[in-house]
Amino acid sequence: MAGSKLVLEGRVSVKGFILGLSVVVIPLIRTLFGHLDWIFDYLTETPGKIAICIHIAVINGLLLILYRGPLYKVAVRACFLGITFGCGVIISFSETTWTHFGWYMCSLSFFHYSEYLVTAVINPHSLSLDSFLLNHSMEYTLAAVSSWVEFTVEKLTVPELKQLSWLSFAGLLMVLCGEGLRKAAMLTAGSNFNHIVQNEKAQSHVLVTGGVYSYFRHPSYVGWFYWSIGTQVMLCNPVCILGYTIASWRFFRERIEEEELSLIHFFAEDYVEYKKKVPTGLPFISGIRVN
């Protein structure tokens, strides 16, 4: 792990995320003078929308005063994720049938923010705005939008489909386990972890086989795979559950084969032996074949 002191960009992101998260304060204050069922109105009724807009404008103005250039770009992204997480918390604790979507908002925003923060801790030299994974790919964006559209359409046309609490809880469990496994993999790999497949071996690059890597060769991908499917199980999105499973499986199969080419080039027989002993962790994916 890269030292105990968090780099400047990491500290800025923490402050930005907390500022965004402060969106939960207004409804909490309001509940002191009203009832809990008002909380959801905070997000849906006109006064609530106005309050959110003013709150965001004030926070953004503060960020513009505090930071410039690259640091502002970090802060505003972290703040956006904090706001999303905060709104998810508000919905999750509201008396509404949209509770599970609140869980989803928290899960999605936390995933993206924690990707940046953990990278800032373990491998600050590779840290960039891309570490948020917000612009991961066009396919990733389309998949996310598709899940929102499916949830909304089915919520309006087949509302009972979105009331399967046991299924949403199962999805939440998948999300928590997947998120935990991925972050454990990142922390275990330390400076060896990178969001981009490396084609050249760095001097500090070592083969990590301990911790969660003793169970799966690619624990970060295993975690991400089940996290992504879990988000759709949580939303009770039957179409996207199938779509996410197929798309994620194909993506990680190709990614693992590409990565293992580099790993065999870097570590030769050491990786081949490790590959023989430890599975990838993903169903029906064995990685690149070695003769």
Task: List the model feature ranges, each with a label.
Residues M1-Q203, G230-N291:
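Membrane-anchoring alpha-helices and their flanking helix-loop junctions
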Residues I196-W224:
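Active-site-proximal inter-transmembrane loops
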